[in-house]
A protein has these predicted regions:
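Conserved alpha-helical scaffold segments that buttress catalytic/binding sites
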Residues: 1-145
């Protein structure tokens, strides 16, 4: 089944990676060998979201899997691997809006939130706002007309 699904995927972009902490070097090497485009959080910080968005092909269907570990822990602290240097709120918002405007988002999921690590509601508030931003961007892009 996995190979059938993978055959229908033209390219994969992983944006906001921060080292090998959540994966072994072999997994990164295999992802690159498969053709995945790996863009670290530091590259996003250095070149900016607009330049990252230029690397993603226009006019495609996009499925976004958002890993909460990729955001800075000041924004998403209730994750399994809170590590400084993640993407900030404005960067993630700009990425979401940029992808919505490049083509068609056909699906979205938000993973790696660990409610047992939450102190207050910081993570869940930001997660909810991300989903609302995605839906709002889709409405403004006339997805539902």
């Amino acid at each position: 089944m996995k190979s059938c699904i993978l055959k229908s995927i033209n390219s994969i972009y992983q944006i906001g990676l921060r080292g090998v902490g959540s994966g072994r070097q072999q997994e990164f090497d295999e992802a690159k060998a498969y053709g995945s485009n790996l863009i670290s959080a530091y590259e996003v910080h250095d070149i900016g979201v607009k330049e990252v968005l230029k690397k993603i092909p226009d006019g495609a269907n996009y499925y976004i899997t958002f890993d909460a570990d990729g955001m800075d822990p000041t924004i998403m602290p209730a994750v399994n691997a809170p590590t400084p240097g993640g993407l900030n709120w404005l960067q993630v918002r700009e990425l979401i809006h940029g992808i919505v405007n490049k083509g068609r988002v056909i699906g979205f999921d938000l993973v790696e939130i660990s409610p047992s690590f939450e102190k207050g509601n910081t993570t869940i508030i930001h997660a909810e706002r991300l989903i609302c931003n995605l839906i709002g961007a889709m409405v403004r892009a006339n997805y539902f007309n």
